[in-house]
Amino acid sequence: MLFAKILALAGLSAAATVETSSVKGKAFDRFVIIYFENQNYDKAFGDPNFTWLANKGITLTNYFAATHPSQPNYMASIAGDYFGLDGDGVVDSPAEVATVIDLLESKNISWAHYEEDMPYTGYTGSSYKNSRGRNDYVRKHNPAIMHKSVSDSTDRLSRVKNMSNIDTSRSSFHTDLENNALPQWMFITPNMTSDGHDSSVTTAGTWCRWFLEPLLTNSNFMQNTLVLVTWDESESYSIRNNILGILVGDAVPSQLVGTTDASFYSHYSEIATVSANWDLPTLGRWDVGANVYQMVANKTGDTIRTWDNATEFQSYYWNDAYGGYFNSNDNLPIPAPNLSLDSNTFNGRHILQSVKDTWANSDAPTYYTDSIKVSDSQHPPPGFSP
């Protein structure tokens, strides 16, 4: 019955676009992001399967999520901000908000989202349940679909694809893998059981090893590939939002396998690293000041910066949202990208031209800088208190 339902729904789906590219990067040629759910650093690192994975790459020990709950972290990971979002309900970011997708497309770098057990390519519903009535796919864990710049575009929707590990014959991920047609940038979201949200860190670790171990030796996947395995947020809201990050893949230099990196990173580092690797512009938001992963910075020449005040750093928890457009208590505008950060920054990168054009005459306030210091609810941007 469930399979018949999927077949019926498939008639409404967007046709999946298969597009490859071969834009050389300075440190990697393919970047894959995999998010797991709601786990404190120590508990994630203590799982034997995640420890196994960490021993095959670089452990990022000082990685921080943006806030709580889940959805704003997914939004931040591609948009360079979460705009005060403090819930998991359906949101649609206005079309003028650019994302990393715009950066990638500016240089014709292929991209896709692969969402486990999403019923079909381009699905925009809030969730999809399995035959037992449990959540498999949820929209709040799909960063692309919460942006109108994607959901209003048939072409972009065709790159938001399904992944099935039960029936690989209907899985866009497995089809693209078999055909050596995976894109250069990927965001992979396990389902609500696989990611640990409705299960446990043990289940998540088991799934991660089962899924990734064969891919680490698959030549259709490993093509100077860097994989980031991380979490959307920590489990405990009362402590600092420190999460585990692991970098693996054949792009990791052999001398760095099994090492740790204690540099300060955030979800915005995911965007900054992509910009540095492929000489892409920025979004003019929190991505401008974010640290690039050290192994990538070794190739790009980026400077890894530290907080200038250790006591101040310890006072940032990133465990609650500052105010903003999506905040349930506010009625504030989307802040403008800081257009003064166009090449006038420590890294010298320009802001994407379409972003400059869109926001050139905006009177919206802005609060972004090229500092690595990122606001939280206790240290909100001016005028954006929660």
Residue spans for each PLM region:
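Fungal secretory targeting signals
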Residues: M1-T17, V274
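N-terminal pro-sequences and low-complexity stem/linker regions of secreted or lumenal proteins
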Residues: A16-P386
